[in-house]
Amino acid sequence: MRSDALEGGLSSLNVVFCSASVGCGHTRASVAVHDALRARGQLAGATFVEALEHAPGWFAGFYRDGYLRAIRHAPRVVGAIYDRTDVPRRDRRPLGSMLDRSEDRILRRFREHLAFTSADVVVSTHFMTTAVLGRMRQRGDLRASLVTVVTDEHPHSVWLHRGCDLTCVASAAARTTAIAGGIDPARVEATGIPIDPKFCMSSPVPFATGESRTPMVLVAGGGHGLGEVEQVVRSMLDSPMRAIVVVVCGKNAELERAMRAIAEARPADAPVELRVLGYTNVMHELMAAADVMVGKPGGLSTTEARAVGLPMVLLRPIPGQEERNADMLVGLGAAVRADRARDAGSIVAGILADPARHWRMRAAASASGRPRAAFDIATRIGALARAGNASDGDRILGRIGA
């Protein structure tokens, strides 16, 4: 770390944010931490580096499209791989070492990005960038302090690297898991998953039977519009409830066209009104106004929902990280699973018809929410900056245990 960064105070920090754009959550987490640092006056400069933009085209295409095809057509295989690879890095040798070397070669242009030479802190919100940067840190190729922000409830071993100066995880349970995976307890903090600071300012609008306000159901199609959204919406339009259903289609133009066609065909006096949005940057307002959210159990979207105390109906979790997220949320009492799309409407109707149940779910979501996680991470980045770089001895220990 540059000496002037310490002498000049926290406001002189240059921070590089690294991720890989597979889905929207990883990038949203980077932006949330950036905005919190900026709000606290800790940024002198910021650079966002998208790893796949600095990789060969064949690799970037395979990485993005291959994963999306796999979760769509072979989710059980994805889950099996997730479970079998959730072991400490030292237990993945020698195959793991070969894959590490291949990854370093493929991402050579990313590793050589000029932004790293002047950075005081590097923040990684994707496990691939964490692995590459962690190895750079251990070799002495990265002088900046390295912070990993895990964007899932469960810190799978691919997120855990002893080259990191700080690993931020979702909860105390996640911290225990990270420590069991070989991370120094002094280098892992239970901060929560960072979300847009706007969620700190969003107050939920409570629904109670007997009020004139029509309850609102938010259907989140996700940044890619994945999932059986059309079936879910039709199940709610056919359900015995009075509600406004707002479906967010993300960047899926085909889904948006289909939803608008359904909405235009609805009679004006239908008990369930359908409203359609494409990609939106006001999810914090929509979630605060909603009474129930229906969507996939992604780490960022469910964290945002909990920040405003929004009960969730979770659609067919993908085996692996989504399954872990869903189990945690259902266990808290903040969510219900809908493993079949056609059941979503009856589940939502049942929640809205039972005010006591709805209130319990809202309270459970709110109690487990950490809307200020991004600010907590910013505080820890500031403390890390004041402490300076890890000692040579620390780096040697990290190299031995990786």
Short names for language-model regions:
Residues 29, 85-182, 187:
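Active-site and donor-binding regions of nucleotide-sugar-utilizing enzymes
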Residues 203, 210-290, 323:
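Donor-nucleotide binding loops and adjacent catalytic segments primarily
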Residues 277-278, 335-341:
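Short acidic-hydrophobic, aromatic-tinged amphipathic segments that line or gate anion-handling sites
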Residues 356-402:
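C-terminal amphipathic helix plus adjacent low-complexity
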Residues 187, 194-209:
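Acidic anion/phosphate-binding donor-loop and adjacent secondary structure
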Residues 32-113:
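Conserved N-terminal ligand/cofactor-binding loop architecture of enzyme catalytic domains
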Residues 331-332, 340-357:
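C-terminal "capping" alpha-helix adjacent to the active site of nucleotide-linked donor transferases
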